[in-house]
Amino acid sequence: EGKDGHPGPALSIADIVATLYLDAMNVDPKNPEWEDRDRFILSKGHACPIWYAALNEKGYFEPKVEHFHLRALGSTFQGHPSMHSTKGIDMTSGSLGNGIAIGAGMAAAAKIQKKDYFTYVICGDGELQEGVCWEGVNMATGRKLDNLVVFVDRNGWQSYKSVDFTVGQNNIADRFRAFGWHTQEISGHDIDGIKAAVAIAKGYKGKPHAIVCDCIKGKGLSFMENNNAWHKGVPTDEQWEIAKKELGGEE
């Protein structure tokens, strides 16, 4: 309704978010502030529509939301997630680059409090240009935060240009390994592969975990896949009809 949004970035991580909330994460929609729940941070906060959809499917909103009224004035579902207005949001985000450092803080708190929960972060490959990301990575290494799992959405695009045009990031996995992280590289659209990677990470002790995912921006829509013009935008009525057919949805 706000006539704006970020559909490409949201679809890039749809399979990861769905797998985390519907399979991997230990959360309770009836008690969203449960002290022992797993934590989730969407560092690339502009992709939040897919987070809202996952929370909805998991049962955080009663009755189930049929129309999100995304970005509408006064709506619970704004263009960047807010922990103060939307149930189930563990951390407000939108200012790129902060998720890993905040996640490291949450994971460190769990260690100090002797809690067993995991903290999951999804960040974009573009935002890894922010120095604070690597400060968080370094801190997590030093504290051996093996309860921290960071997914990197390696779709190759950022707001206006390719990531490689701005600053080459082809060696993302090697950078994490150089910092001492347990690192895996997978497809971000293989549900079984995502499940397996999470299981491996949770069983590997002594190091924080990076799961670098090869993703396709706008995944699932023929007119949107790998088309950076859809970093922002709103489909036309005709494109909505195409999207419903290609994604198998009704609305």
What are these regions (language model features)?
Residues 15, 46-47, 51, 155-156, ...:
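Glycine-rich beta-alpha junction loops
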Residues 6, 46, 79-80, 98, ...:
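Histidine-centered active-site/metal-ligand motif
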Residues 11-142:
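Cofactor-binding active-site loop characterized by glycine-rich and histidine/acidic residues
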Residues 41, 149, 185, 210-212:
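Structured core elements
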Residues 88, 92-203:
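Thiamine diphosphate
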Residues 191-251:
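Glycine/aspartate-rich loop-and-adjacent alpha/beta segment that forms the canonical ThDP
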Residues 1-4, 153-155:
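N-terminal capping segment at the start of a domain
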Residues 4-11:
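Structural motif
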